[in-house]
């Protein structure tokens, strides 16, 4: 009897590397899009930005989210690209008093309270956001 065997690899430059030789972040870039595109269950993802970079989030993860509008995917994240570019339907801003967690704000991406939460907590405040926007203005 032959056993099934799946060999997952990541194209790194011009070389395919087996998943067993990859870093945690590289493993996430291989597995996360597969999970998101082939599951019809509720998926909970806890802080993916801990192991993957913003380039992967904006180029691959967001695309996977937009292709899976029928699945319920719950993210715990500090990265504003995930709810904003992923066009989250519901956002819950959690806070803690040091003992207990509680919901500070909940609503759609376009609710003022949610916009304020995203800009303050995830972006570092409106001043930080404006400074980054000014920094990225590159003359061509």
List where the protein language model places each region:
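C-terminal amphipathic alpha-helical interaction region
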Residues: 6-9, 43, 55
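Phosphate-binding P-loop
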Residues: 11, 35-37, 67
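GG-anchored amphipathic helix commonly corresponding to the ABC/SMC/Rad50 NBD signature/C-loop
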Residues: 24-45
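Walker B catalytic motif
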Residues: 45-49, 53
């Amino acid at each position: 009897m032959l056993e099934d065997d799946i060999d997952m690899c990541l194209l790194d430059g011009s070389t395919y590397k087996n998943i067993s030789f990859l870093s945690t972040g590289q493993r996430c870039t291989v597995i996360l899009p597969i999970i998101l595109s082939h599951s019809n269950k509720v998926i909970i993802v806890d802080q993916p930005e801990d192991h993957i970079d913003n380039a992967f989030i904006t180029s691959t993860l967001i695309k996977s989210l937009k292709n899976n509008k029928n699945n319920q995917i719950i993210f715990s994240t500090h990265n504003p690209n995930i709810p904003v570019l992923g066009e989250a339907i519901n956002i819950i801003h959690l806070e803690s008093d040091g003992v207990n967690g509680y919901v500070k704000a909940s609503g759609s991406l376009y609710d003022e309270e949610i916009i304020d939460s995203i800009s303050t907590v995830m972006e570092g405040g409106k001043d930080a956001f404006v400074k980054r926007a000014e920094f990225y203005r590159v003359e061509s």
